[in-house]
Amino acid sequence: MLKKLVLLLTVGISTLVTAATPGTYFYGLNYGINPNACPSYEQIKGDFEKIQLYTNRVRTFSMSVCNQGALALQAANELGMNIYLGMWIDTPATFESEMAALTNVMQSGASFDKVDAIIVGSEVLYRKDTDENTLADYIKKVGQLVRPKGIQVTTADVYYEFPPVVVAELDFLMMNAFPYWEGVTVENGATTLIEHFNSAVLGKSLGKPVRISETGWPSSGPNFGASIASPENEKLYLSNALCLTRKNNIDMIYFSAFDEPYKAGVEAHWGIMNPDGTLKTDLSTSLFANPTC
C-alpha cells in the first residue's frame, strides 16, 4: 500500500448519487488469502457468496499461491461472478510459477468468459520488485498467452508509477491509491483519491481507460499523520469514495472484502466485513446504496 506524503485537497460538496441495488453496491471488492493457511475450494466459494451480497465482481492476487487462481476461477464461474485474476510477480522465479499456473488453468478447459482481465503484478514498481522494462516484458508475455482468447491484460500500481513503456503494453490502467498512507484527514481522503485519478494517471494513460484497483481506509490501528484509523473514518471514507467514483463514472475495486487478521498492525483492518463474513457494525447496505459526498 501507498505510504507517500503528498497533497491535501479540500473540497466542500454535498450531493447524493443514484442509489445502487443489492449485488451492485461496489464495482468490485479485493479478496486476499492467508498464504500460510490455504483455503479450500469450499472456503473460497463461501467467501465469494458473502462478497456477492455487495458486488458481483472480485479481484485476486496470485495464480499459484495455494492454487488460488484455479480455485477462485472455479468458484466465480459456479456463482456467475466476474473476476480479475491477479499474478504475483515479486521475483523472476515467481513470475515463472505464476505463468505456469495460468497456463495450466487455461489448458484445463475452464471458462474464462467471466474473467475481466489478468492483472500482471500488484505495485511491483512501487516496491521496486522489478524494473519497468522487465514488467513490460512480463505483460507482453502474458498478453501473448491470453489475448488470443479475448482476455485483457493490465497491471496495478500506485498512481505515479505508470511509465510509457509499461502503459504501451496495457489494455487499460489500474490505479492504487490510499490517502490514509498520505497522512491526509479523512475528510480530504476521497477528494485526494479523485485528484490522483484525474491529474496523475489520466495524463499518463495514452487515452486508455483507467480503473481504481485498490483504495480504502482502516477501521483500527495506529494513525499516520493526520490520517486516523477508526470505524467512523472507515465509514466516512467509504461513503465519500463510493459517492465520488459513481458521480465521476469511475470503476473502483474497493480494498477490501474482509479484515485479514493474519496480517500485522493496521494492515489487518481494511475489510468491509469481519473475518467471519459479517458486515462491520458501522457499515450498512443503506450506506452502500446511498453514499454521500
Protein language model annotation of sequence segments:
Residues 27-31, 56-60, 83-86, 116-120, ...:
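Hydrophobic faces of well-ordered beta-strands that scaffold small-molecule active sites
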Residues 20-23, 47-53, 67-82, 101-114, ...:
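Acidic (Asp/Glu)-rich catalytic clusters
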Residues 177-181, 206-234, 258-263, 268:
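Active-site clefts of carbohydrate-active enzymes
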Residues 223-230, 244-293:
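Aromatic-rich peripheral "rim/lid" segments of glycoside hydrolase catalytic domains that contact
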Residues 143-163, 208-215, 251-262:
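Aromatic-lined carbohydrate-recognition surfaces of secreted/lumenal glycan-active proteins
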Residues 20-57, 64:
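Boundary/entry segment of secreted carbohydrate-active catalytic domains
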Residues 116, 122, 157-196, 211, ...:
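Aromatic- and acid-rich polysaccharide-binding/catalytic face
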Residues 32-36, 41, 63, 68-152:
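Substrate-binding cleft of extracellular glycoside hydrolase catalytic domains
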